[in-house]
């Protein structure tokens, strides 16, 4: 998240929700840790409309696994503690 982290993103999302604005979450080339944090944050906001968190696919490898799953173009978090990364 290029806005200052999870806290700043939630603050922006709250302001948008108060004003009836829907959200689109996106990223640049990011690790699975960062994308997992953004996905968890996006899914916690009722005004999230679109999610485009595919930056990991541009990277050749990552230090961790897990974090989320992507099936049929739909991203979802894993049923694991924390961000679900290991």
Segments from the language model and where they lie:
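Shared catalytic-loop signature of beta/alpha-barrel
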Residues: 1-74
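Catalytic-core signal marking the mid-to-C-terminal active-site face
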Residues: 79
